[in-house]
A protein has these predicted regions:
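Bacterial N-terminal signal peptides that target proteins for export
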Residues: 1-12
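N-terminal acidic, proline/glycine-rich, low-complexity intrinsically disordered segments
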Residues: 2, 24-25
Length: 385
């Protein structure tokens, strides 16, 4: 087992939040050291517009939050360009009537509040954060599986990531207990390929689900939760094997490398963004392979933004692309995030939400939009170098 490690960035973020919010109950407008340059009025206005838009989005999310602490949304999975609702999952109407919610959407919404500097005991949205933390903890089963309304391993991973970020920023015994159990389940569910799939203990793996689990494990380990080193190493090896090593698509990632559909797709925006992000978080920065993948993301962004602006592809893909390009830094990220921010601002609805027409629904789109717009604040550990 690895010695517990506490990520310095997570501690600094928590300390900065506490110091700032003792003097002011509202969440801080910007994190220390992240203010846009005063010499660039256009970028300064963009940042201010982004902060205002994100706050309107958070207000919409707060108004939509249910008494259980979560958000209702369609439980399903991507199939080609469509989103298929699972037969065994609770419908949105059933969730609302029975006090259940969509776990992954709720965890992402919780992360949106954290990204704005709100904690369970700090910030204007502290009550929403408290409620969603309690909701996610309540979704923990005896075996450690985090699930609600029929959600699967995607939701488990995002819920684990959310708990890790909350625990790193605010602590809490109940959060720690649920987090440790959820991490143990991920470890136990890792298959012989080194990855994960939709359901616990699936024999096959795919890169999308695997990256979610790996990022959750890394986040947990960084704030002191014990994770076997071998589990991380095997997952990283799976991601590495998913990468094209030569030829026209050098550096790009395959969605699957075994079973049906293996080696069929390696030019998908979200998959390549997720692959680079996973390796970056593991400290692997191979310029020869990463540069082609990052350049692919910049080229592919225009198509995703133009044709999939309200689609699951846009929100999920940019969640990872923003992390991958931010870790790379420099002019590539600046160019990307300026375009991304302007596109997101243009899509905000009059009531403050963002649409997600193909996917879980508008709570998902709004939460993702708020996370991406608030990235410059760097409160979330996933957006700290």
């Amino acid at each position: 087992m690895l010695r517990p490690m506490v990520r310095p960035g997570a501690i600094l973020a928590a300390v900065a939040l506490c110091a700032l919010t003792r003097a002011q109950d509202a969440a801080p407008a910007t994190a220390p050291g992240t203010s846009p340059s005063a010499t660039d009025p256009a970028l300064l206005r963009l940042r201010e517009d982004s902060d205002r838009a994100a706050e309107r989005g958070l207000q919409w999310l707060a108004a939509q939050q249910m008494d259980c602490g979560g958000w209702a949304a369609l439980v399903g999975h991507k199939m080609m360009d469509d989103y298929v609702v699972l037969d065994q999952a609770l419908s949105v109407e059933e969730q609302r009537a029975r006090g259940h919610a969509h776990l992954r959407v709720s965890a992402i919404a919780g992360m949106a509040f954290l990204a704005g500097g709100h904690l369970p005991d700090r910030g204007t949205h502290r009550e929403s954060v408290r409620k969603v933390v309690d909701y996610v903890v309540a979704c923990s089963r005896d075996n450690g599986f985090l699930t609600d309304s029929g959600t699967r391993m995607y939701s488990h991973a995002f819920a684990t990531l959310f708990l890790a970020e909350v625990y790193g920023m605010a602590g809490g015994e109940a959060v720690q207990a649920a987090l440790e159990k959820s991490v143990n389940l991920i470890v136990d569910c890792q298959n012989t390929q080194g990855g994960w799939r939709y359901n616990p203990f699936d024999r096959e793996a795919d890169l999308s689900v695997t990256v979610c689990q790996l990022q959750a494990l890394r986040a947990a380990r960084n704030i002191g939760i014990k994770v076997p080193e071998d589990t991380i190493d095997r997952a990283v090896a799976y991601v590495q094997r998913s990468r094209t090593r030569s030829g026209r698509n050098q550096g790009l990632f395959y969605y699957k490398i075994q079973g049906r559909g293996a080696y069929e797709k390696n030019r998908e925006f979200a998959i390549n963004a997720a692959g680079v992000t996973a390796l970056n978080s593991a400290g692997i920065h191979d310029r020869e392979l990463s540069d082609p993948a990052l350049e692919f993301l910049l080229r592919a962004y225009a198509e995703v933004a133009d044709y999939y602006a309200t689609h699951y592809y846009f929100w999920y893909g940019n969640y990872y692309a923003c992390q991958a390009l931010f870790q790379d830094g420099g002019p590539r990220f600046a160019r990307y995030h300026e375009r991304l921010s302007r596109d997101i601002l243009a899509g905000q609805q009059a009531d403050g939400r963002w649409r997600n027409d193909c996917g879980p629904g508008d709570a998902f789109g709004t939460a993702m939009a708020c996370i991406l717009l608030q990235q410059p604040r760097q409160y979330l550990p996933i957006f700290q170098r």
